[in-house]
UniProtKB/Swiss-Prot annotation:
Taxonomic source organism: Saccharophagus degradans (strain 2-40 / ATCC 43961 / DSM 17024)
Name of the coding gene: ubiD
Catalyzed reactions: a 4-hydroxy-3-(all-trans-polyprenyl)benzoate + H(+) = a 2-(all-trans-polyprenyl)phenol + CO2
Membrane topology: Peripheral membrane protein
Cofactor binding remark: Binds 1 prenylated FMN per subunit.
Family annotation (HAMAP family): UbiD
Protein name per its UniProtKB record: 3-octaprenyl-4-hydroxybenzoate carboxy-lyase
Signal sequence interval, chain numbering: none
Keyword Membrane tagged: yes
Chief subcellular location: membrane
Length: 490
């Protein structure tokens, strides 16, 4: 499945009964959130609100509201197929040298495919069919959602922010929410370690006192959107990765007011700058934790120009207590993470981010334990290997006889294989999500690792328990006579 733009994806979803057009008048103030939330929790379709109160532009919501739709957006038939995407990323992250001529020939197509996926620069792009600039810029004309009753303002939730540092060979694509504070002003909420913030910091050092150019795409094609939230190796651009997912080069075009390249098929492009020293208080907003976050100061993005397609569609979402779209994305991307982790730690059998853990705050790992202390090595490896797990507060490691995705199994392992004093690892003063108000200091807190594996000699002085298992002979015998017993008869 290859989607040139968001509209291609919408058409396929509608064909498969996975998109619902809503003609009834719906308000972007709170109502779209409530409808989307109920639909997502029921495993329902993507929603295209065609009659948005106060606006002529339709709103697309709940696009990635099921793991299968995430997989479809990444060009795969189902969630299980995302393991193949993870295997490709694992190879690209740490490619192994060929073991011989035959191996070299087998790997050659992969390298050629990657090299051939550099974005394609085009002119006369659909995203630039129409333009408003200067005094005519009016962000309030876009049906930006106000998601929750306590939110400070309307919030842009699916912006693909394009930046480039002065010393970087390639652009950074990141998704950072943006609060509307004026007809041409948005607050850019990027945390200090994120790519956009790092680019901005380098720019200020290289060009003190100068405005930092920024472009933002709204409503890009699904592969490009999902490429921006996937752990792409530093050697591969998000545009190139989107091309690999799509099977064709990502078409980009040069912004009209700066040199940044933006997705050519996006519904909207916002062009502008961040002026040095221009900051504003952002929030509070309801977030993926299920709570309102604290107010904090972030840079202001001044929009100088808006270009858009004919009859544009505004792509939006909300975040709230799981399940929400970020949690669903986490479930799907979980399958991408597994091969990447297993390449670094072959002893890992499965890795699971429970969606109720706010996408990434808790991880469960099952492994083939090989020596005393092995579980601790794995938990420390999870925290340090991918930047996506830097904010994971709890890591539970257990044996491969436990199903990481079954809480009955996990709780059994925790309560039977763990001594809290011996098997708990606490790490203080580590990076924590700024939205985590439970930490004593904003952005800095502790982590807990729990070793729920069977203990080896050296880890305990006691005789370890043996699990109870029925013999295969008896199981087979009962299977053969089960229907005759009449137990399942109603």
């Amino acid at each position: 499945m290859a989607f040139k733009d968001l509209r291609d994806f919408i058409a396929l979803l509608e064909e498969k009964g996975q998109l619902k057009r809503i003609s009834h008048p719906v308000d972007p103030y709170l109502e779209i959130t409530e409808i989307s939330d109920r639909t997502l929790r029921a495993g329902g379709p993507a929603l295209l609100f065609e009659n948005v109160v106060g606006h002529t532009t339709p709103v697309l919501a709940n696009l990635f509201g099921t793991p299968d739709r995430v997989a479809m957006g990444m060009g795969q038939e189902n969630v299980g197929a995302l393991r193949e995407v993870g295997e490709l990323l694992a190879f690209l992250k740490e490619p192994e040298p060929p073991k011989g001529m035959k191996d070299a020939w087998e790997k050659l197509p992969i390298f050629k495919q990657v090299l051939n996926m550099a974005p394609k620069l085009i002119k006369n792009a659909p995203c630039q069919e129409f333009e408003v600039s200067g005094e005519d810029v009016d962000l309030t004309a876009i049906p930006i959602q106000t998601c929750w009753p306590g939110d400070a303002a309307p919030l842009v939730t699916w912006p693909l922010v394009v930046t480039k540092g002065p010393h970087k060979d390639r652009q950074n694509l990141g998704i950072y929410r943006m609060q509307l504070i004026g007809k041409n002003k948005l607050i850019m909420r990027w945390l200090s370690h994120r790519g956009g913030a790092l680019d901005f910091r380098e720019w200020q050092q290289q060009h003190p006192g100068e405005n930092f150019p920024v472009s933002v795409a709204l409503g890009a094609d699904p592969a490009t959107i999902l490429g921006a939230v996937t752990p792409v190796p530093d050697t591969l651009s998000e545009y190139a990765f989107a091309g690999l997912l799509r099977g064709s080069k990502t078409e980009v075009t040069k912004s009209r007011g700066n040199d940044l390249q933006v997705p050519a098929s996006a519904e909207y492009i916002l062009e502008g700058h961040i002026a040095p020293g221009e900051m504003a208080d952002e929030g509070p907003f309801g977030d993926h934790t299920g709570y309102y976050n604290e107010v904090d100061s972030f840079p202001v993005f001044t929009v100088e120009r808006i270009t858009h397609r004919k009859d544009p569609i505004y792509h939006s979402t909300y975040t709230g207590r799981p399940p929400d779209e970020p949690a669903v994305l986490g479930v799907a991307l979980n399958e991408v993470f597994v091969p990447i982790l297993k390449k670094q730690f072959p002893e890992i059998v499965d890795f699971y981010l429970p969606p109720e853990g706010c996408s990434y705050r808790m991880a469960v790992v099952t492994m083939k334990k090989q020596y005393p202390g092995h579980a601790k090595r794995v938990m420390l490896g999870v925290w340090s290997f991918l930047r996506q797990f830097m904010y994971t507060k709890f890591v539970i490691v257990t044996d491969d006889d436990v199903n990481a995705r079954d809480w009955n199994d996990v709780i059994w392992a925790l309560t039977t294989r763990v001594d809290p004093m011996r098997d708990t690892t606490m790490i203080d003063n580590t990076p924590i999500d700024y939205l985590d108000f439970a930490s004593p200091v904003s952005g800095l807190g502790s982590k807990m690792g729990i070793d729920a594996t069977n203990k080896w000699p050296g880890e305990t002085n006691r005789e370890w328990g043996t699990t109870i298992e029925m013999t295969a002979e008896v199981k087979n015998k009962v299977d053969a006579i089960w229907d005759k017993l009449g137990i399942d008869d109603k």
